[in-house]
Amino acid sequence: MARIAILTADIAIASDGVADYSRLLAAELARQGHEVLLIGLMQSSGQWVRYFNTDHQAELNPQQHWPERLERVRQLITDFNPGLVSFQYVCFSFGRYGLPIHIGRDIRQVIGDKPLELMAHELWTCISRPADMKTYLLGTLQQLNFRELLRQIRPQCVHVSNPAYVRLLERIGCRASVLPLFGNIPVTDVKDSWLSSFTDHLRLMIFGSIHPEWSPSPLMEKLVEFADSINRRLMIISAGSQGRGKDVWRNMVDQYQARIAFHALGRMDAGRVSALMNAADYGIATSPMSLIGKSGTAAAMLEHDMPVIVTRDEPCYSVGRVEPAEGYGRFIRLDDSFEMQMRKYLGQSREMQSRLPLVAKEIINILMK
């Protein structure tokens, strides 16, 4: 049995993807028999500390100023005495403009000499493409701030979600390895009866936020052509919040609704999402291929062993095109092999499996090194 402390910005339910990630990881580590302390450093209301699989308790004040909050965290860490601290980092969660200048110093002060694993969910802006001068300067400052973070926290290991980030960190002298994201949708073997009833349709699914830069064309035209070739109608559903991509969805419906049946189902419980994934023929990812590994929604579809169509293949700015980690999932690109890949995966049996248990075991393995 090990003791793990997980530090992140927020642990409230539905606050953001990293909060979901941290809570699920803590629960899985506890399921595997370990004791876990989970702390939301920046959380200003609600329960910002949780214990898993332990009798530890803490009296908390969510309205503390930052110095008082740090001292309370230091006391909690000292009392819990973890063998490893896992820091789940996103720059914009810890400071205005994504520049938390002293966060590394503060983290190292509260954990003392405990070994630390850094999971960098985001690095800095301007990664996917060049930007205007103001954004470029912000990204440059964030990169310098990240270098300082590494110097201050002295991590035992650094994890990222995708190979593009590994290359970016190599360029600043940091050795990192890929720890694949797990989805926040528990994997089931249930198929949604409503979606399954459309047996004469080719059923595609978009889950969660739609990237505002994603373009439905020419994918929609190719899908219509493929559906016609196998004598099926075409159906696209959206499950969950579309985020900043609501206008993309609305414009897509306006343009293609004469040839495609669209259904925006909105938010729903995780069990229904899993059932829809099991009933859909394909998933559609709106993130670029180079950064697909950092998409939690893509991770959920891939854990359900869905063939996932990726239309964006622009290079990752400054490191070029980067392929996903080997064996990460079944992808269909919008290239000359599109129809062949669509036919190959249609109706194939699936081997659904959550990555969460493997990720938790990898965290424990750090203690063994």
Language-model features: where?
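A charged, aromatic-enriched C-terminal amphipathic alpha-helix characteristic of glycosyltransferases
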Residues: 32, 335-369
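Nucleotide-sugar donor phosphate/pyrophosphate-binding loop at the beta->alpha transition
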Residues: 117, 125-149, 164, 185-189
